[in-house]
């Protein structure tokens, strides 16, 4: 007779995902980030739920309610710091997860990849509306600047902005709806994650060699369940250390000032994890062009499978593409730095060059390198 985990209708599903799942025997620690993102999502939902119990989404009391959470609620300061810094760790894991997918050719599982891009966009939207909730200076002005980008849409732009705002400026209606969205989106992310996993388990995981590993599979438990636990421990120790010792390291000092529509902060900038996209937006002197470039910087990921020209899946054995991949990483880091700098010489031109390089790598340089490598293989 089969054990309960193999026969029970619900446990059977969990068994197929977490216990008896066939996994390639050679996947490295780079394959840990999917489960780490699951841990981040669970942490964010849990801490967010406790914050929502004490938060008020009204412009008169939002800032005070966050102060009340930190001062008067039992361990409120810890919950708030874990939630704020948890977002940073969420994005660190996302960028490493996407980087892994690009390096090892995991994007050739097109359905899984496209659901992943949708998850990325939804996570960015969730983080953006969440950043508005404390109703500090950067919350207010960040919301004003980013929502104003919608006005670049021809013909319906201004109506669209006012529709998002719920009035003629960022006001109480905006804060209330942003709180509603921020509460809702993580559950949509959780549902999409289930679809992401469903598509992944249709094909099975890729591996560092980029080769078919059907002949050499091992069960997920105990091999990768324990391997993931090491990642869990590392993530939680790092996150709690940051939340306890340096909780405001990644935040903006301007957000400790209550929102004031009459005073503009000297430098309006988003959280660090959006700076690369913000730099691309600012690199184009035209408003509509900037918005299109901003969208393209994320949506270009959906084009990656179509631009795959190599006969090999992974870049493990492709030195030219490896060099270009790390150039892409460098370009994103430079853009992140530029996004936090004022709009003046020499930062403008550096940002423009890095933006151009970012798009060229995806659209021309990496596909061209793949074709060159294919040619080199034929010489043998």
UniProtKB/Swiss-Prot annotation:
Transmembrane parts of this sequence: 33-53, 77-98, 113-133, 178-198, 226-246, 288-308, 320-340, 347-367
InterPro entries: Cyt_b/b6_C (IPR005798), Cyt_b/b6_C_sf (IPR036150), Cyt_b/b6_N (IPR005797), Cytb/b6-like_sf (IPR027387), Cytochrome_b (IPR030689), Cytochrome_b_C_euk/bac (IPR048260), Cytochrome_b_N_euk/bac (IPR048259), Di-haem_cyt_TM (IPR016174)
More info: Heme 1 (or BL or b562) is low-potential and absorbs at about 562 nm, and heme 2 (or BH or b566) is high-potential and absorbs at about 566 nm.
Organism of derivation: Percopsis transmontana (Sand roller)
Positions annotated to bind heme b b566: 97, 196
Protein name: Cytochrome b
SUPFAM superfamilies linked to this entry: a domain/subunit of cytochrome bc1 complex (Ubiquinol-cytochrome c reductase), Transmembrane di-heme cytochromes
Localisation per UniProt entry: Mitochondrion inner membrane
Residues that coordinate or bind heme b b562: 83, 182
Record flagged with keyword Lyase: no
Cofactor annotation comment: Binds 2 heme b groups non-covalently.
Sequence similarity: Belongs to the cytochrome b family.
Residues the record lists as binding a ubiquinone: 201
Summary of the function given for this chain in its UniProt record: Component of the ubiquinol-cytochrome c reductase complex (complex III or cytochrome b-c1 complex) that is part of the mitochondrial respiratory chain. The b-c1 complex mediates electron transfer from ubiquinol to cytochrome c. Contributes to the generation of a proton gradient across the mitochondrial membrane that is then used for ATP synthesis.
């Amino acid at each position: 007779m089969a054990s309960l985990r193999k026969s029970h209708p619900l446990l059977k599903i969990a068994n197929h995902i977490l216990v008896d799942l066939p996994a390639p025997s050679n996947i490295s620690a780079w394959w840990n980030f999917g489960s780490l993102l699951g841990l981040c999502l669970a942490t964010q939902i849990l801490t967010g739920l406790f914050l929502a119990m004490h938060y008020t989404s009204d412009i008169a009391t939002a800032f005070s309610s966050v102060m009340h959470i930190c001062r008067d609620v039992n361990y409120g300061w810890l919950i708030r710091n874990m939630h704020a810094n948890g977002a940073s760790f969420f994005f660190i894991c996302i960028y490493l997860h996407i980087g892994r997918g690009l390096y090892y050719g995991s994007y050739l599982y097109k359905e899984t990849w496209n659901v992943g891009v949708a998850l990325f966009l939804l996570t960015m939207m969730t983080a953006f509306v969440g950043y508005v909730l404390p109703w500090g200076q950067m919350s207010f002005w960040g919301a004003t600047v980013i929502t104003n980008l919608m006005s670049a849409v021809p013909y319906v732009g201004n109506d669209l902005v006012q529709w998002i705002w719920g009035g003629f400026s960022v006001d109480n209606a905006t804060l209330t709806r942003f709180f509603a969205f921020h509460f809702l989106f993580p559950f949509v992310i959780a549902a999409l994650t289930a679809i992401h996993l469903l598509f992944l388990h249709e094909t099975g995981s890729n591996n560092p060699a980029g080769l078919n590993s059907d002949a050499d599979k091992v069960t997920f438990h105990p091999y990768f369940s324990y391997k993931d636990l090491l990642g869990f421990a590392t993530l939680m120790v790092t996150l709690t250390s940051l939340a306890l010792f340096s909780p405001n390291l990644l935040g903006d000092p301007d957000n400790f000032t209550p929102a004031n529509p009459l005073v503009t902060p000297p430098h309006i900038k988003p959280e660090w994890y959006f700076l690369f996209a913000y730099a691309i937006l600012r690199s184009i002197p035209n408003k509509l062009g900037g918005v299109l470039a901003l969208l393209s910087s994320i949506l270009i990921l959906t084009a990656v499978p179509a631009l795959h020209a190599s006969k090999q899946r992974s870049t493990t054995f492709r030195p030219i593409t490896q060099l270009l991949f790390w150039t892409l990483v460098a370009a994103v880091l430079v853009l992140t730095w530029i996004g936090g700098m004022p709009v003046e010489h020499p930062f403008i031109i550096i940002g423009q060059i890095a933006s151009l390089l970012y798009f060229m790598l995806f659209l021309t340089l990496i596909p061209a390198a793949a074709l060159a490598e294919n040619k080199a293989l034929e010489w043998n």
